[in-house]
Design a protein with these regions (language model features):
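Core SAM-dependent methyltransferase catalytic element
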Residues: 205-222
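A short glycine-rich, Lys/Arg-flanked "PGG" loop and its adjoining helix->strand segment in the class I
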Residues: 136-153
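Short, glycine-/aromatic-enriched active-site segment of Class I SAM-dependent methyltransferases
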Residues: 158-175
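Conserved class I S-adenosyl-L-methionine
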Residues: 57-67
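S-adenosyl-L-methionine
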Residues: 84-133, 137
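Conserved S-adenosyl-L-methionine
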Residues: 74-82
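A basic, amphipathic helix-loop patch mediating RNA/tRNA/ribosome contacts
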Residues: 1-25, 60
Length: 222
């Protein structure tokens, strides 16, 4: 059941999104291999780094909404020099990553408070995976932390970007037009904040409850 909810099970022509979904008897099912990262979030960021040709090697990085550390793990495995990992929660972050000297973990910390802790203009690359809030709410703090020409690569979750009335039962956005409008709102916010958008792509795996998610990348141009 967990594999289905994680978007890891598919038939030859479609991905299964519900454990109760019916398929024809005898049909072949394919299960995606397990992640090499501490969480499946690493696979999402891996896709974004490849799609937008972003190389973290030697860079000072920021992970907003680090949770268990999938994004942080991906950055480190790609050669990041350091990662400031931030989350409002606590006791979720991987024990293995906690021991890594390249990681500075800020738990129980809102991103808006981070510039006062670490200073301004200190990161080359920021990545983000936040829930129950819009990516646009973290933009001002991220911009303050980014160096000139720094890159911001974020996961965009339409279920937290779209108006409440456009989110379907169970918190799932099934309407493609609603998903695209949500993505466009974040894209527009990027441009208004001073980020030149390099592109967007769909996440290789779905989010919670099968929600389609996107990756959006921008480079600071002012």
């Amino acid at each position: 059941m967990r594999a289905v909810m994680a978007g890891e099970v598919s038939t030859t022509d479609r991905r299964l999104t519900s454990p109760g979904e019916q398929v024809r008897p005898g049909i072949d099912l394919h299960v995606r291999g397990r992640s090499c990262y501490v969480s499946r979030g690493g696979l999402k960021l891996e896709r974004g780094l490849s799609a937008f040709d972003v190389n973290p090697e030697g860079l000072s990085c920021l992970d907003v909404g680090c949770s268990t550390g999938g994004f942080t793990d991906c950055l480190l495995k790609r050669g990041a020099a350091s990662v400031i990992s931030v989350d409002v929660g606590y006791a979720q972050f991987s024990w293995e990553l906690r021991q890594d000297p390249r990681v500075r973990l800020l738990e129980r910390t809102n991103i808006v408070d981070v510039p006062a802790v670490v200073g301004s203009g200190v990161v080359d690359l920021a990545v983000c995976d936040v829930s129950f809030t819009s990516v646009t709410t973290v933009l001002p703090a991220v911009m303050e932390l980014l160096r000139p020409s720094g890159t911001f690569l974020t996961l965009v979750k339409p279920q937290f970007e779209a108006p409440r009335e456009d989110v379907g039962e169970g918190g799932v956005v099934r309407d493609q037009a609603v998903r695209e409008a949500a993505l466009e709102r974040v894209r527009s916010a990027f441009e208004q904040a001073g980020l030149m958008v390099r592109g967007t792509c769909e996440s290789p795996i779905t989010g919670h409850k099968g929600n389609v998610e996107y990756l959006l990348c921008g480079v600071r141009d002012r």
